[in-house]
């Protein structure tokens, strides 16, 4: 399920005793250089370093995810590896599906994460729609395939 929330992703309320997942589409080069990723870099510098090191130590990241314990308590950052800047929008959507499926597997056993209607809540902006240039409707359609997750999509 996708729920649209007007507001700032970074002001998402953290339920008592829970952790929230803030997800965004990432490149595989280890650079949160522009768009929403640059905001993540400024707000979570230690997480940015961990993401960068992870990218430099690993290969074949497209279609996978990486969860980082953020600089702030109770916030997990989910990096969705959807592009290395060489993909068409269709390929990015394909890798988005794979990375969301990977994330779903990784968070399925997390007891302490925020849930909506019994489903793990993934909080995100309109991923892929900025620098990666994918029409939001294409990514939205991909997210709708995951009925085991609840997506809070923040729009300004």
Swiss-Prot record:
GO terms for molecular function: ADP-ribosyl-[dinitrogen reductase] hydrolase activity; phosphoprotein phosphatase activity. It comes from the Eukaryota. SUPFAM superfamilies: Macro domain-like. GO terms for cellular component: nucleoplasm. Its EC number is 3.1.3.84. Gene3D superfamilies: Leucine Aminopeptidase, subunit E, domain 1. Residues 1-156 form the Macro domain. Keywords: Hydrolase, Protein phosphatase. One of its GO terms (biological process) is DNA damage response. Substrate binds at residues 7-9, 25-27, 32-37, 127-133. Belongs to the POA1 family. This is ADP-ribose 1''-phosphate phosphatase. It comes from Candida albicans (strain SC5314 / ATCC MYA-2876). The gene is POA1.
